């Protein structure tokens, strides 16, 4: 630990950035594969690929809500457990973990019951048509029955990470992703199960990951053990955890609201093909944003440590290294999408009509995709510098203040209303990127003014 601290304060910034960013980047890429592999296989189902992909895409709002509830307990409980560990109060840390596990299991029962029976009506509301609804229901109901595994994996894996077992935590995702990738073609094409096979593959992969987590947290290697005696809910233990997790819950649940806003509007103005295109666009957007998150996760400890040590020259170097990588990646990826939109659309479906429509939509929806690198790198840097509230506000600025209202406002000013809905994304992207970047550099300049009074190495 001492050597790590010395390296963080004196070692090569670029080398340290690479050492810390690569594992985080690998984890994000694995997560990305987990998220989009089902859609790639489904989109290439013979004859029904386009309709099936559209139907499965309509399940996204429910999936995001399940994720949000997992984060409520996981993202709120893990930091509290870490604090208790730092205070040498292992018993309290284990009690926190046990209480969070109980909440996740209670949520699993409630969400499974509510969403299983309500999903046909919800999917209709989200924009499902007679052609896409059967595929949406087929995938959704199987996935929902496996919610207990999903909540376990997303919520409890954070307690492995917070103990310092980063590799074990990463393996949780890798194991699930590999099983999902292997099972998808076997069940979908080998056994002819189609969409149902994709859902079963996802649930089985999550189940294996859940067993992996529980075996670790009840085994000999873990620092904190999951014990039955700690699963009885204690208000003084669980309420602070849920209070801390509410910001993560809000961030993820707003993604659900955003998805509903897009699909309901596009269903109304563009029909199934527009909703299907949105499913592909969401996946392509993840190809942009998730690697950026990995880079920023690697840069965060380096920026935070040197900021705390008042080594502002190293903070500056670390930030601009992160900023440069993020902007370069998004610019190159954006240029490739603008030049070869049909190629990117074709990755997700073999439906010719959907490919052509999606290729057109890519050039509208991602017209300002290059700006995402600016926004995410600056927003995450705010977080690394301890400015969590500003970081949260900047994230909500794009989604809640700009994008969601624009989805409903812009169609009033254009004859092609589906075009107007897609246009909301680049408008929100460029405005949010400009505001976030300007605010960060103003903050950064103020920080630089304090440099004269600080000792730098």
Model-derived features with residue positions:
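N-terminal transmembrane alpha-helices
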Residues: 8-48, 61-76, 80, 105-112, ...
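Helix-terminus/linker motif at the lipid-water interface of multi-pass membrane proteins
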Residues: 29, 33-53, 123-130, 186-192, ...
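Small-residue-rich hydrophobic transmembrane alpha-helices
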Residues: 53-113, 150-169, 263, 277-341, ...
């Amino acid at each position: 630990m001492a050597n790590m601290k010395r390296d963080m304060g004196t070692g090569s910034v670029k080398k340290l950035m690479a050492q810390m960013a690569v594992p985080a980047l690998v984890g994000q890429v694995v997560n990305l594969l987990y998220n989009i592999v089902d859609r790639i296989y489904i989109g290439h189902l013979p004859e029904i690929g386009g309709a099936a992909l559209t139907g499965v895409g309509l399940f996204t709002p429910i999936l995001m809500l399940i994720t949000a509830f997992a984060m409520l307990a996981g993202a709120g409980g893990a930091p509290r457990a870490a604090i208790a560990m730092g205070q040498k109060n292992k018993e309290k840390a284990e009690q926190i973990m046990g209480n969070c596990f109980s909440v996740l299991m209670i949520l699993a029962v409630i969400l499974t019951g509510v969403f299983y029976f309500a999903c046909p009506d919800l999917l209709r509301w989200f924009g499902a048509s007679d052609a896409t609804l059967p595929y949406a229901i087929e995938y959704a109901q199987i996935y929902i029955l496996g919610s207990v595994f999903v909540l376990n994996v997303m919520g409890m894996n954070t307690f492995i990470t917070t103990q310092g077992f980063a590799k074990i935590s990463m393996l949780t995702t890798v194991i699930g992703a590999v099983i999902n990738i292997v099972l998808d073609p076997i069940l979908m094409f080998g056994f002819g199960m189609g969409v149902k096979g994709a859902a079963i593959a996802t649930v089985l992969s999550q189940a294996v990951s859940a067993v992996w987590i529980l075996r670790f947290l009840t085994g000999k290697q873990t620092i904190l053990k999951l014990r039955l005696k700690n699963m009885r809910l204690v208000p003084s233990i669980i309420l602070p955890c849920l209070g801390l997790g509410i910001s993560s819950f809000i961030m993820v649940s707003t993604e659900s609201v955003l998805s509903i806003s897009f699909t309901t509007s596009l269903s109304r103005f563009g029909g199934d093909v527009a909703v299907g295109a949105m499913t592909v666009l969401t996946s392509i957007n993840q190809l942009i944003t998730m690697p950026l998150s990995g880079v920023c996760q690697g840069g965060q400890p380096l920026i935070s440590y040197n900021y705390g040590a008042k080594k502002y020259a190293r903070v500056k170097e670390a930030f601009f290294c992160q900023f440069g990588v993020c902007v370069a990646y998004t610019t190159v990826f954006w240029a490739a999408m603008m030049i070869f939109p049909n190629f990117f659309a074709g990755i997700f479906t073999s439906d010719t009509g959907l490919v052509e429509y999606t290729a057109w939509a890519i050039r509208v929806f991602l017209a300002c995709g290059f700006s995402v690198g600016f926004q995410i790198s600056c927003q995450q840097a705010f977080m690394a510098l301890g400015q969590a509230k500003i970081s949260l506000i900047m994230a909500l600025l794009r989604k809640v203040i700009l994008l969601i209202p624009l989805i409903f406002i812009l169609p009033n000013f254009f004859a092609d209303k589906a075009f107007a809905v897609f246009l909301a994304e680049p408008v929100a992207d460029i405005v949010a990127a400009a505001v976030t970047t300007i605010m960060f550099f103003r903050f950064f300049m103020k920080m630089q003014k304090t440099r004269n009074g600080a000792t730098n190495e």
